[in-house]
Amino acid sequence: MGFLSGKRILVTGVASKLSIAYGIAQAMHREGAELAFTYQNDKLKGRVEEFAAQLGSSIVLPCDVAEDASIDAMFAELGNVWPKFDGFVHSIGFAPGDQLDGDYVNAVTREGFKVAHDISSYSFVAMAKACRTMLNPGSALLTLSYLGAERAIPNYNVMGLAKASLEANVRYMANAMGPEGVRVNAISAGPIRTLAASGIKDFRKMLAHCEAVTPIRRTVTIEDVGNSAAFLCSDLSAGISGEVVHVDGGFSIAAMNELELK
C-alpha cells in the first residue's frame, strides 16, 4: 500500500507525457492516490482523458484559470463525485511569447506583466479560495516554481517576477490555511524539456549548462519532481508548510563550477 493511499488529489497542467504534472501524477498514482484532472480547452481534452485513464481516473474536468466562473464550475462539478478531497497540484504558468525573449526592460509590457501574474500566480490562490470548504484536514496544496523567482535568468524575464509572486503566495496561503490543517508548498524544479519550456529562447543552452555544472552532473527529470511532489502531498511531510523545495540537483546552491570544466 502506497503512502498516498486514501488520498484524493486534483492535478492540473497535464499537457503531454513530458509535462512535469504528468510525472507528478504518475508518482501519486503509484503511491495509491485517487486522481482527478483538469484541462484548459477542448484541444487538450482527449489527450488528458487518455492520460487519466492510464492512471486509473475517469474524472477529467474543464477549467480555464483565467476565469473565476470556470474555476467555480469545475469545483462544483468535482464536488458531485468528491464532496471532500485532499489537495491539488497547481502546475500552471503562462506569459505571452514576446515577453520571453531578450532584454527584460525592453520586452516587458503592462499587459504581459498582468497576464503572467494572473495566470501563473493569482490562479493558485483563486483555486484555493474556490475549494477551501471542500478540503479535508491534512490536505496539501502544491505549486511549481523555478529559480528565475530568485535570480535573473536570461529570457525568463517577467515569468521570474510571476514565480516570485507565486512563492510569496505560498507563504501567505500556508499561514492563512494552516489553522484548518491545510499545508501549502512549492517545488522549484530545475529546467526540464517540456512544452512550456520550449517557449523560452535558448532553452537548450540552459539545459546543457545546467547538466555541466549542477553538483549531480545531470538535469532533473519529471520523475525526480514527481517523487518529491508525492512526498510533499503525503502525511510523511506533515510538518512541512510554506516552503519552496528545490528539486534541481543542487544547481541553486552551487557557484563557479564551470571553472572546473576549463
From Swiss-Prot:
Please state what class of enzyme this protein is.
oxidoreductase
Q: Where is the active site?
A: 146 (proton acceptor), 156 (proton acceptor)
Keywords assigned:
Antibiotic resistance, Biotin biosynthesis, Fatty acid biosynthesis, Fatty acid metabolism, Lipid biosynthesis, Lipid metabolism, NAD, Oxidoreductase
Supply one GO BP term: biotin biosynthetic process
**UniProt keyword annotation of NAD present:** yes
Catalyzed reactions per annotation: a 2,3-saturated acyl-[ACP] + NAD(+) = a (2E)-enoyl-[ACP] + NADH + H(+)
Amino acids binding substrate: 95
Q: Which InterPro entries match?
A: Enoyl-ACP_Rdtase_NADH (IPR014358), NAD(P)-bd_dom_sf (IPR036291), SDR_fam (IPR002347)
What does the annotation say about its assembly with partners?
Homotetramer.
The keyword Lipid biosynthesis appears for this protein: yes
| Function summary | Catalyzes the reduction of a carbon-carbon double bond in an enoyl moiety that is covalently linked to an acyl carrier protein (ACP). Involved in the elongation cycle of fatty acid which are used in the lipid metabolism and in the biotin biosynthesis.
Instruction: Name the chain's protein.
Output: Enoyl-[acyl-carrier-protein] reductase [NADH] FabI
Q: What else is known?
A: The antibiotic diazaborine interferes with the activity by binding to the protein.
**Top-level taxonomic group:** Bacteria
Stated family = Belongs to the short-chain dehydrogenases/reductases (SDR) family. FabI subfamily.
The positions annotated as site (Involved in acyl-ACP binding) read: 201, 204-205
Q: Which NCBIfam families match?
A: PRK07984.1 (NF005938)
Binding, NAD(+): 13, 19-20, 40, 64-65, 92, 163, 192-196
Pathways involved: Lipid metabolism; fatty acid biosynthesis; Cofactor biosynthesis; biotin biosynthesis
Species of provenance: Salmonella typhimurium (strain LT2 / SGSC1412 / ATCC 700720)
